[in-house]
Amino acid sequence: MWGGRGRHFGVRGSVCGFLAVAVLVVGTVVGCGGGNSEAEGSDRPTTIGTEALAAPTVDGRFKVAADGRRLYLTCWGEGSPTVVLDSGHPDGTGIADFGDTEFRRRLAAETRVCAYDRADWGRSDPAPNKPRNADDVVDDLDTLLEAAEVDGPFVLAGSSFGGMIAAHFADRHPDDLAGVVLLDVPAPSATLSAEEIPEIAWDHPANPEHLDIGPEFENRFANSPPSFPAPLVVITATGGDSSVEDQQAWLRSSADAHQVELTGGHEVYLDDPAGAAAEVLTLLDR
């Protein structure tokens, strides 16, 4: 964990692996296709219960930088708003995290839902070899969606570290926004540093995205929280990585914000996929 902040830091499959995901979940209220593509096939779930589900509607690598760097994106289903899922750090393999889940299949049966692999994860190209900040990551996602011809409005849903990305995207692109969901996202720390947790240094081998996590994410958002006009749902898991009180800090990001508590662990979308999907669809209709 990161200095007591509750974020697991490790690789998929390790004891402290961080399989972070983005979802919206049902609970008890407790507070306030396109261009530049190199398409690649993939094995995807084809059923939701006994109902057939169509193959991906977007599936490929899309150019996000002038030097030719590409990120991998997959979308399923049709409809609007589009739900964009963002996983945590350092496990930025959103497609692997979300693709083979009942939660994702339920969403795709009702609207378009997209997941992507951030830089140096899955089938995406390596990140530039320099410190990267929140603007860099949001620019990657914005360019990726544009290159793939995936239009808004969007519901940005991010778990743990991915929630910071979702909230900052919302701050930067309010006109493309239908809502934001934060799943078990601890409040940012104003003091977290690489001296305390060496693995979050931008050039540490455990940080292949080269994200400058201390000053450019944790400290930045603790001192200047993202702000946006769209509805915000803060999900706190009863067995998750941070308390209800801690995560209430995110509520100031939107005037239309509330917090819910869901029984489950950090990956609560796996514990209650039907409830998670139902709550997302409720937000889409607002």
Where in this protein do the model-derived segments appear?
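Conserved HGGG/HGGXW glycine-rich cap/lid loop of the alpha/beta-hydrolase fold
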Residues: 65-123
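Conserved serine/cysteine hydrolase catalytic core
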Residues: 202-269
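Secretory targeting and sorting signals
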Residues: 2-36
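C-terminal region of N-terminal signal peptides and the immediate post-cleavage residues
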Residues: 26-52
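Active-site loop/oxyanion-hole signature of alpha/beta-hydrolase fold enzymes
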Residues: 115-155
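Post-His helix in hydrolase/transferase enzymes
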Residues: 270-282
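Flexible "cap/lid" loop of the alpha/beta hydrolase fold
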Residues: 180-210
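Conserved hydrolase catalytic core segment
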Residues: 151-189
